[in-house]
């Protein structure tokens, strides 16, 4: 475990919201960092490190990272609902935990924003969300990981489980 902690700590020390080292290929291509599923996976892992260790540096990093992207009105820099891309829902999973811990109302507003994408996502005849608007009628396994847990969490917490039948 020590080697993992050391690796994660070094990675975080070298990372900022503008230049996360775990997403180095974007930096090498000269692309601006934006709201994305890779950062969502990593920040979720950082929050798990906090939950396990109770070391505030992990919470601070995760909060600073997501806080950088989320405006007070809940809008998210680099996030476009219009893309209809289920990948973009993944980072939204971090908002629930950060909202619980910090109480920042902007995180609650951002949760609602990400949830609003669920309502407009195109679907296959079977009811599954398309992976992306640009891939009609395609369902990808990682897309289910990206979207369904967020959808379920939102329904459980904020919508009286009204759409559970849609999720199952």
Language model segments and positions:
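Blade-loop segments of beta-propeller domains
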Residues: 63-100
């Amino acid at each position: 475990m020590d080697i993992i902690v050391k690796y994660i700590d070094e990675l975080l020390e070298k990372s900022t919201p503008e230049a996360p080292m775990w997403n180095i290929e974007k930096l090498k291509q000269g692309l601006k960092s934006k709201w994305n599923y890779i950062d969502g996976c990593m920040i979720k892992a950082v929050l798990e490190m906090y939950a396990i260790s109770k070391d505030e540096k992990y919470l601070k990093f995760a909060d600073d990272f997501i806080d950088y992207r989320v405006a007070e009105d809940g809008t998210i820099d680099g996030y476009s609902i219009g893309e209809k891309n289920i990948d973009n829902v993944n980072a939204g999973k971090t908002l629930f935990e950060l909202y619980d811990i910090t109480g920042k109302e902007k995180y609650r507003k951002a949760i609602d924003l990400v949830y609003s994408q669920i309502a407009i996502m195109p679907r296959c005849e079977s009811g599954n969300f398309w992976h992306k608007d640009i891939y009609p009628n395609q369902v990808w396994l990682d897309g289910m990981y990206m979207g369904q847990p967020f959808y379920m969490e939102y329904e459980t917490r904020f919508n009286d489980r009204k759409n559970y039948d849609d999720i199952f």
